[in-house]
Regions:
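N-terminal cap/lid segment of alpha/beta-hydrolase-fold proteins
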Residues: 24-53
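The serine-hydrolase catalytic nucleophile loop
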Residues: 66-78, 93, 250-251
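Short alpha-helix in the alpha/beta-hydrolase fold that links the catalytic acid
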Residues: 74, 234, 248-258
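Conserved alpha/beta-hydrolase
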Residues: 78-98
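Catalytic nucleophile-loop/oxyanion-hole region of alpha/beta-hydrolase
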Residues: 94-128
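Primarily recognizes the serine-hydrolase "nucleophile elbow" in alpha/beta-hydrolase
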Residues: 118-120, 126-182
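Short beta-strand/loop motif that positions the catalytic acidic residue
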Residues: 232, 238-240, 244
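Catalytic histidine-centered segment of alpha/beta-hydrolase-like enzymes
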Residues: 273-283
Length: 298
């Protein structure tokens, strides 16, 4: 069934790419986009533009590890938000899907920047950032590092927290440290581009370069969400399923405590919802819609 859904969606995306932008149900314009980052990487995504945009608001939507712009949460949330009147741009990051990973985490800022630039070029204001799973680390980093004044708020779902700590929770401190030590040793020897076979537990195994490992988990990583959220001075929504076995719901509590003083952080915890919000999609949609409406009406 999952293969069939993926096949049907792939065919749909091909049809979009071969035909001019169309109006779905005469209310939402759907368009395949290809954007080039300032460092020369071409990214693909889907832009959804409602005929009537609620308060002229747009949402840039960022997937998590091994994800893409059309599966998992990205298969339903961008569409649901556009049906509610918000323009959405769901874009592949440069390390999308389950292929080998060689980029550094910090390169993600170029991917998010080109999406924000595109939404601003199209005239959307305010613009919000959405991140799912490891995408939460990406959008928190972008917001904290750039201080982009075009971003009016940040939405997070299923945040995994500090990525080295996540590995410790799966494999224990000794095993997680051994992998990081090996990667750091390779980088120190000028072999940062050497491939390593990395065990990701419930996510399977993947090829990472040593540079990629260190950029995600090293002591100087910029991916730490607890540090980054403390540097964000915009409203934040965090939605977490209480049955999430991939990203501990306690991470949300720690993010709340780490936020800058006086910043309004809304937390929604959904009983029974897992990491992908299976069977609870509407709960997530409702929470995101309510928060966005509240923010755009201010």
């Amino acid at each position: 069934m999952r293969f069939l859904k993926s096949f049907v969606l792939a065919v749909f995306l091909v049809l979009i790419s071969l035909n001019p932008p169309a109006w779905a149900d005469e209310t939402v314009r759907i368009q395949m986009v290809r954007l080039q980052t300032t460092d020369g990487v071409t990214l693909t995504g889907v832009l959804r533009q409602p005929h009537t945009v609620r308060n002229n608001a747009g949402v840039v939507m960022v997937h998590g590890y091994s994800g893409n712009f059309y599966s998992g949460i990205m298969a339903f949330l961008p569409e649901a938000l556009s049906d509610s009147g918000f323009a959405t741009l769901a874009l592949n990051m440069r390390d999308h899907d389950r292929g080998p990973k060689k980029n550094r985490f910090e390169d993600n800022r170029y991917d998010i920047a080109v999406a924000v630039d595109e939404m601003a070029r199209l005239g959307y204001n305010p613009i919000f950032l959405f991140g799912n799973s490891m995408g939460t680390n990406r959008v928190l980093y972008y917001s904290a590092t750039t201080g982009d004044s075009r971003i009016k708020g940040v939405l997070l779902t299923g945040p995994p927290g500090n990525l080295f700590e996540w590995n410790i929770s799966i494999f224990g401190h000794e095993a997680a440290s051994q992998v990081l030590d090996q990667a750091q040793d390779l980088v120190a020897k000028g072999k940062g581009n050497q491939w390593m076979l990395i065990n990701l537990g419930p996510l399977g195994k993947a090829l990472y370069t040593a540079n990629h490992v260190v950029s995600l988990r090293g002591p100087k990583t910029v991916s730490d969400p607890y540090k980054n959220i403390s540097q964000i001075f915009k409203p934040i929504l965090i939605v977490h399923g209480l049955a999430d076995r991939l990203a501990n719901p306690d991470v949300t509590d720690r993010l709340l405590k780490s936020a800058a003083p006086g910043i309004h952080v809304t937390v929604v915890k959904i009983p029974g919802a897992n990491h992908g919000f299976s069977g609870h999609q509407q709960d997530l949609v409702t929470a995101a819609n309510k928060w966005l409406i509240d923010q755009t009406n201010r």
